[in-house]
Design a protein with these regions (language model features):
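Acidic catalytic/metal-coordinating carboxylates
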Residues: 37-38, 64-67
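Acidic, metal-coordinating helix/loop segments flanking the phosphotransfer/catalytic sites
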Residues: 35-53
Length: 243
């Protein structure tokens, strides 16, 4: 694994002894660890830290752990979070989990509990990253279609058959079939049903990705997300770990 591929875990806790203890624990499983004493220090890091998982205290000087979680959710940044706290209760735990946290651990907690939660977070991050790469390729393939191919793909996704498409576009059925074959190949679709699934996802990702053909030829491209960049612009125990 290259250094650039190695997961980074951001630990945000205002207690230096806890931060260093967590760094030591996480490094035992060969993880890179970045330490921060506050949310502001994390968001203001230069260069920005883009972690695969965040170990986050609830109570911090300045912005709280919950406030960071809220900001990330609002910016559609889905970095997995493992909350740790010495002052937790059930409502706090429910709040964190409902907002997407991997785990909510009350200090003191067992080392293995934290390691298991961080591993789960990293695996989730990898899975999401893989999905994003796959769909980025789909968007690139769609952008590579001609205007006519985009028109035909839109109509195919709406259940039109070749004869109907030919009549609407004023071309022969043979021409439509040739275009359909080229579209399937370019989009990496194994079948018409697969192409329809891809088209539905494109429309979900961007309402303008498949404009109604009745309003004229499609002339736009799916947008790519820039939320992570927006956030980064604004902006590591052995035994039982207790604050």
């Amino acid at each position: 694994m290259n250094d650039s591929d190695q997961p980074i875990v951001a630990v945000i806790d205002d207690d230096e002894s806890v931060r260093e203890s967590l760094r030591g624990l996480l490094e035992t499983i060969s993880l890179k660890v970045a330490l921060f004493r506050s949310v502001e220090a994390f968001l203001g890091a230069n260069p920005p830290v883009l972690p695969s998982c965040i170990v986050l205290d609830v109570r911090l000087p300045g912005a709280s752990g919950f406030e960071l979680q809220k900001q990330l959710v609002a910016a559609h940044v889905d970095t997995p979070i493992v909350f740790i706290t010495g002052h937790g209760d059930i409502p706090m735990s429910v709040r964190a989990m409902k907002a997407g946290a991997i785990e909510f651990l009350s200090k003191p907690f067992r080392e293995q509990e934290l390691l298991d939660a961080v591993r789960q977070g990293i695996e989730r991050h990898r899975a999401r990253a893989g999905q994003r790469r796959a769909w980025a390729q789909i968007h690139e393939r769609f952008a590579g279609l001609t205007d006519r191919e985009k028109e035909i793909m839109t109509l195919l996704a709406r259940g039109r058959v070749s004869k109907q498409i030919a009549g609407q576009l004023g071309v022969s059925e043979v021409t439509v079939r040739v275009h359909r074959s080229q579209i399937l190949q370019k989009m990496g679709a194994s079948s018409l049903a697969d192409l329809v699934r891809i088209a539905d996802r494109l429309k979900t990702d961007d309402e303008n990705a498949l404009d109604p053909v009745a309003e004229g030829p499609y002339d736009g491209l799916p947008r790519t997300s820039r939320t992570a960049k927006r956030v980064t612009r604004k902006q590591k125990g052995r035994g039982n770990l207790a604050k």
